[in-house]
Amino acid sequence: MSDDDNSPISAREAKQLFAELKSAPALVLAVSGGPDSIALMWLAARWQRSLARGPRLTVVTVDHGLRAEAAREAREVKRLATELGLPHRTLRWRGAKPKTGLPAAAREARYRLLMQAARSAGASHVLTAHTRDDQAETLLMRLVRGSGLAGLSAMARLTERDGIVLARPLLDVPKAQLIATLKRAKIGFADDPTNRDTAFTRPRLRALLPQLAAEGGDARSLARLAARLARANAAVEVLTDGAERFLRLRDRDDAPHGPDMRSFEAGAFATLPEEVRLRMLLRAINALGHEGPAELGKVETLLAALDQAIAAGMAAAPRAAVNGRPVLKQTLAGALISLAGGRIQIAPAPARRRKGDRGGS
């Protein structure tokens, strides 16, 4: 890409942005009507026309039902998509909207609807218009929330969701360059006022970016930091894979294992680096629990309790196991974690009784 953040994107640069998607059978473009997604649609259409045989493109707009202007904006997207020779669908988020956590709920609904649209269109990928500016904002949001290394890696260029690849081809492109591209092409776009609504966290942090940029922390620097953290996170994931294989290889033949249980020899587990131990617990709890992803802070607390119990003396664990009393037993995110007989075991926890339920007949 050009080093000039205010220069329009050339046809050659657009070809590079979409190059890895050339062999896909079909692509869904998520287009809201704002400048970023309108630029995505225009650039993708121009790229497709340059190919002898490119992927089929379908434009999808999600109307969350939160603003009166959204329906008009969806119609405008459809008009422009038609001019570009692309089919368009508008999908609506129906049902009650939550009073708290609205941005997260709207985002989840949007992705669910987009994945459904991709399956209907026979598309292998959904393309979103996240930019370098979005990446910087995401890093800041996760930083102030105290996220771990995985969270601070921010958004990946390619991720899989429900069997569909979510692609962000503009992740290294500044928003200003997309706006310059649209201005040169004389293409209009919508302005979503919620992007400036300081009732939400992202707009408040967005307002801080000019001050950070004055100190050298501009979107380019923050996005570069996210990329470096993502590189480190990928390395730790490989180390965690290796640690899991190591524990399996050194385990005894009669050790309890199965699709509904993860089991580690406690002494060997304790020798691993703390971050690796934490990730092994997170993986097991998220795989076997039935109450959604575990919170990082709670898993950190669990790991500290396990470390303390193991350090207190492995000699006590066999005696406790004989008496049927685990040294440690906790539930977290729908998983049951226990330390007994010198082993850490993780399995699905029994379903919680709902208030008013009674046992027996």
From Swiss-Prot:
UniProt superkingdom: Bacteria
Coiled coil: none
Keywords: ATP-binding, Cytoplasm, Ligase, Nucleotide-binding, tRNA processing
Cell compartment(s), UniProt: Cytoplasm
Molecular-function GO terms, alphabetical: ATP binding; tRNA(Ile)-lysidine synthase activity
Catalytic activity reported: cytidine(34) in tRNA(Ile2) + L-lysine + ATP = lysidine(34) in tRNA(Ile2) + AMP + diphosphate + H(+)
Protein family (similarity comment): Belongs to the tRNA(Ile)-lysidine synthase family.
General function of this protein: Ligates lysine onto the cytidine present at position 34 of the AUA codon-specific tRNA(Ile) that contains the anticodon CAU, in an ATP-dependent manner. Cytidine is converted to lysidine, thus changing the amino acid specificity of the tRNA from methionine to isoleucine.
Name the UniProt record assigns to this protein: tRNA(Ile)-lysidine synthase
Record organism: Bradyrhizobium diazoefficiens (strain JCM 10833 / BCRC 13528 / IAM 13628 / NBRC 14792 / USDA 110)
Name of the gene: tilS
